[in-house]
């Protein structure tokens, strides 16, 4: 059953980046449940193909379309938007979810690790935002929505050295979202911009950050009742379901037991 306020999105197209697992997969599923066509992209699409089959067998009214895309490569991103334009008209909702962290500190981290984080967390998000807006503009879509999955690390810096460069990229997302909101107003459009900033979410994120210390990664999720990816997906649905005159800039959400 469609959530109140979500009826207007039925059969329209949403792009979800980083849809192969965690928050991205949960968001893609939630949108398909609400009757949207969802292009879910990632570098590998096996998990997205499985999720698409699950959604179909469950009888959800929407459709999940897997698309292989390396978001660190601008040509891949542009090719994806071109394919969406030719096959599905264009993007009405853009969920910039893809993000990564590398354990590269400011004093001794590798430049390649910093570039990996910057390329995906900042540049890919910005390229997808630009292309999504242009897709909406060329079709006279005036009610689109761009949602950036940010982080509480975009609002405070933890005393944890392996997160400091990552946090800088997320502060950039905070600034980019507000800058986007201002530019959309200057363009006199009703397209909205929102970022959602979760705290600790139980995904594979900590295991990738602490890839050489799986016990430390596991402890991240064992010390409290964490958010689930579905909690963040619920926030996405809430944002999309709000009336057109309401602009939600940022949702900050933590586990109740999270201190920082």
Swiss-Prot record:
Q: Which residues form the active site?
A: 166 (proton acceptor)
Where, subcellularly, is it found? Secreted
According to its UniProt record, which reaction does this protein catalyse? a 3beta-hydroxysteroid + NADP(+) = a 3-oxosteroid + NADPH + H(+); 17beta-estradiol + NAD(+) = estrone + NADH + H(+); 17beta-estradiol + NADP(+) = estrone + NADPH + H(+)
Q: In which pathway does it act?
A: Steroid biosynthesis; estrogen biosynthesis
Q: Which CDD domains match?
A: Mgc4172-like_SDR_c
Main site of residence? secreted
- Gene Ontology biological process terms, A to Z: estrogen biosynthetic process; steroid biosynthetic process
Question: For this UniProt entry, what's an example GO CC term?
Answer: extracellular region
Report the leader peptide range: 1-30
Q: Which PANTHER family match?
A: DEHYDROGENASE/REDUCTASE SDR FAMILY MEMBER 11 (PTHR43115), DEHYDROGENASE_REDUCTASE SDR FAMILY MEMBER 11 (PTHR43115:SF4)
| Subunit text | Homotetramer.
Give the record's family classification: Belongs to the short-chain dehydrogenases/reductases (SDR) family.
Q: What does this protein do?
A: Catalyzes the conversion of the 17-keto group of estrone, 4- and 5-androstenes and 5-alpha-androstanes into their 17-beta-hydroxyl metabolites and the conversion of the 3-keto group of 3-, 3,17- and 3,20- diketosteroids into their 3-hydroxyl metabolites. Exhibits reductive 3-beta-hydroxysteroid dehydrogenase activity toward 5-beta-androstanes, 5-beta-pregnanes, 4-pregnenes and bile acids. May also reduce endogenous and exogenous alpha-dicarbonyl compounds and xenobiotic alicyclic ketones.
Would you tell me the protein name for this molecule? Dehydrogenase/reductase SDR family member 11
Organism, by scientific name, is Homo sapiens
């Amino acid at each position: 059953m469609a959530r109140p306020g979500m009826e207007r999105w039925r059969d329209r197209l949403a792009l979800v980046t980083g849809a192969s697992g965690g928050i991205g997969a949960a968001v893609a599923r939630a949108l398909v449940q609400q009757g949207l066509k969802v292009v879910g992209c990632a570098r590998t699409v096996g998990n997205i193909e499985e999720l698409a089959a699950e959604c179909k067998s469950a009888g959800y009214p929407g459709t999940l379309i897997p698309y292989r895309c390396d978001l660190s490569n601008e040509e891949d991103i542009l090719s994806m938007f071109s394919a969406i334009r030719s096959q599905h008209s264009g993007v009405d909702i853009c969920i910039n979810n893809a993000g990564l962290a590398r354990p590269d500190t400011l004093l001794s981290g590798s430049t390649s690790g910093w570039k990996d984080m910057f390329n995906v967390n900042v540049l890919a998000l910005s390229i997808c935002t630009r292309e999504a807006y242009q897709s909406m503009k060329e079709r006279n879509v005036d009610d689109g929505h761009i949602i950036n999955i940010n982080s509480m690390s975009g609002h405070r810096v933890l005393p944890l050295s392996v997160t400091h460069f990552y946090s800088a990229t997320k502060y950039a997302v905070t600034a980019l979202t507000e800058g986007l909101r201002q530019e959309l107003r200057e363009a006199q459009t009703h397209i909205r911009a929102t970022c959602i900033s979760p705290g600790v979410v139980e995904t594979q994120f900590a295991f990738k950050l602490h890839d050489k210390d799986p016990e430390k990664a596991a402890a991240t999720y064992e010390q409290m009742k964490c958010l689930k990816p579905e909690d963040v997906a619920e926030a996405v649905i809430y944002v999309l379901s709000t009336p057109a005159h309401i602009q939600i800039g940022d949702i900050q959400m933590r586990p109740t037991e999270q201190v920082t």
